[in-house]
Swiss-Prot record:
This is Tyrosine-protein phosphatase non-receptor type substrate 1. Its main location: membrane. GO terms for biological process: actin filament organization; cell motility; cell-matrix adhesion; cytoskeleton organization; granulocyte migration; hematopoietic progenitor cell differentiation; negative regulation of canonical NF-kappaB signal transduction; negative regulation of chemokine (C-C motif) ligand 5 production. Residues 32-373 are extracellular. Highly expressed in cerebral cortex, brain, spinal cord, cerebellum and spleen, and at much lower levels in kidney, thymus, heart, lung and liver. Within the cerebellum, highly expressed throughout the molecular layer, and in synaptic glomeruli in the granule cell layer. Detected in neurons of the hippocampus and dentate gyrus, and in olfactory bulb. Not detected in Purkinje cells. Highly expressed in the plexiform layers, optic fiber layer and the outer segments of the photoreceptor layer in the retina. Highly expressed in macrophages. It comes from the Eukaryota.
């Protein structure tokens, strides 16, 4: 006997209970309506740091995965899914394996400018035979990567410029984010106005580059000057970056060359000096040429540095005047920083000319008029000395003539006075008791016919005269001799008179027998 089945009247209530039970189970499982929430609209992070992108759900149904994307549309990039795969630098914040976990936030480490963009948290429904279907997406979180700009690099012209030349300098920096940035130029503390400044790209990008150009007018005092490019950005905390260009690497100051003569060390030697002043850089070569032929080659090593950064160099060249019979042209040739040579010439008179003039003279081909001023001054001084010497000699001559006129003893100018002179001499001889008495007489002899000129003879003469005196009371005759010693003849200078008179002095020694 078969068991009896449920009565048909009881089947309806049973099905109703099953449907109610299923409805209650579904309501408890889903809880709330599905909603994907990304609380932050944007976050900023410095390059190299970490950031967290938050995402929460209100329900896990329908069943399906949750994924993170950067960007929207077909070109969006999958960043992370919670399927257990390994993704460098990205991790989930919560443990998604726990029952009823609703937190699907992620952490990005070591952020780079390439990580900038808008990130979306997306809920999918798993399909049985078809691909998963996107159900809902969060509002998106934009990540701003604060990337510091690279240190500015300043570049200048390839070749050195000269004073008063205009040269351009360029400053570049890259890899910064966000796009806003400030760039300024300075020279020796004074701000310069740039010719052009550009930031690329013009639209949105993960990082940006900046380039700026400025024009500088060089001058000879710029050897120690600097051109500075200053970059300010939000990531630098009010400490701008600077790029520096030393103008000493971009300027050339040519030397001023002078050739001068120093005081001679002897009558046959002259020092020539070649000075190269205020030049930069220190690359210098100096060559001495003699009549166009190389005489000496200098490679300076010990240069004198000026306070403005330029250099000086002095080269000495000793000239032996006795070795040159003709005029010689000496050339100082200066080659600086592989530029055309600068030459200065200096002409030196030969030994034949200099011996006639008493000293060696030089004539610089460059403007050396100060040497002539020295010569003129010396000449005037010498002329004054000559005039003074002539005046002194003239006064001395007059005094000598007056002295001769005052010391002259008795002068006899007429021939008939000779007899009286003889009588006076005889009287003097008779009155003399000492045989060695010396008598001085001024004999002005009568003028006779002018003798022919003859060669000068010594002034000291010794003459002997025999003088016979008159009879004396004694029986024997007395013979007296006179020794005329040290006769000095003094002739006067020619005068307007026809013939000048002259006087003779004699020393008479009388010997009595």
């Amino acid at each position: 006997m078969e068991p009896a089945g449920p009565a048909p009247g009881r089947l309806g209530p049973l099905l109703l209970c099953l449907l109610l039970s299923a409805s209650c189970f579904c309501t408890g499982a889903t809880g709330k309506e599905l909603k994907v929430t990304q609380p932050e609209k944007s976050v900023s992070v410095a390059a190299g740091d970490s950031t967290v992108l938050n995402c929460t759900l209100t329900s896990l149904l329908p069943v399906g995965p949750i994924r993170w994307y950067r960007g929207v549309g077909p070109s969006r990039l999958l960043i992370y899914s919670f399927a257990g795969e390994y993704v460098p630098r990205i991790r989930n914040v919560s443990d998604t394996t726990k029952r009823n976990n609703m937190d699907f936030s992620i952490r990005i480490s070591n952020v780079t400018p390439a990580d900038a963009g808008i990130y979306y948290c997306v809920k999918f429904q798993k399909g049985s035979s078809e691909p998963d279907t996107e159900i809902q997406s969060g509002g998106g979180t934009e990540v701003y990567v604060l990337a510091k700009p690279s240190p500015p690099e300043v570049s200048g012209p390839a070749d050195r410029g000269i004073p008063d030349q205009k040269v351009n300098f360029t400053c570049k920096s890259h890899g910064f984010s966000p796009r806003n940035i400030t760039l300024k130029w300075f020279k020796d503390g004074q701000e310069l106005h740039p010719l052009e400044t550009t930031v690329n790209p013009s639209g949105k990008n993960v990082s940006y580059n900046i380039s700026s150009t400025v024009r500088v007018v060089l001058n000879s005092m710029d050897v120690n000057s600097k051109v500075i490019c200053e970059v300010a950005h939000i990531t630098l905390d009010r400490s701008p970056l600077r790029g520096i260009a030393n103008l000493s690497n971009f300027i050339r100051v040519s030397p001023t060359v002078k050739v001068t003569q120093q005081s001679p060390t002897s009558m046959n030697q002259v020092n020539l000096t070649c000075r190269a002043e205020r030049f930069y850089p220190e690359d210098l070569q100096l060559i001495w040429l003699e009549n166009g032929n190389v005489s000496r080659n200098d490679t300076p090593k010990n240069l004198t540095k000026n306070t403005d950064g330029t250099y000086n160099y002095t080269s000495l060249f000793l000239v032996n005047s006795s070795a040159h019979r003709e005029d010689v042209v000496f050339t100082c040739q200066v080659k600086h920083d592989q530029q055309p040579a600068i030459t200065r010439n200096h002409t030196v008179l030969g030994f034949a000319h200099s011996s006639d003039q008493g000293s060696m003279q030089t004539f610089p081909d460059n403007n050396a008029t100060h040497n002539w001023n020295v010569f003129i001054g010396v000449g005037v001084a010498c002329a004054l000395l000559v005039v003074l010497l002539m005046a002194a000699l003239y006064l001395l001559r007059i005094k000598q003539k007056k002295a001769k006129g005052s010391t002259s003893s008795t002068r006899l100018h007429e021939p008939e006075k000779n007899a009286r002179e003889i009588t006076q001499v005889q009287s003097l001889i008779q009155d003399t008791n000492d045989i060695n008495d010396i008598t001085y007489a001024d004999l002005n002899l009568p003028k006779e016919k002018k003798p022919a000129p003859r060669a000068p003879e010594p002034n000291n003469h010794t003459e002997y005269a025999s003088i016979e005196t008159g009879k004396v009371p004694r029986p024997e005759d007395t013979l007296t001799y006179a020794d005329l010693d040290m006769v000095h003849l003094s002739r006067a200078q020619p005068a307007p008179k026809p013939e000048p008179s002259f006087s003779e002095y004699a020393s008479v020694q009388v010997q009595r027998k």
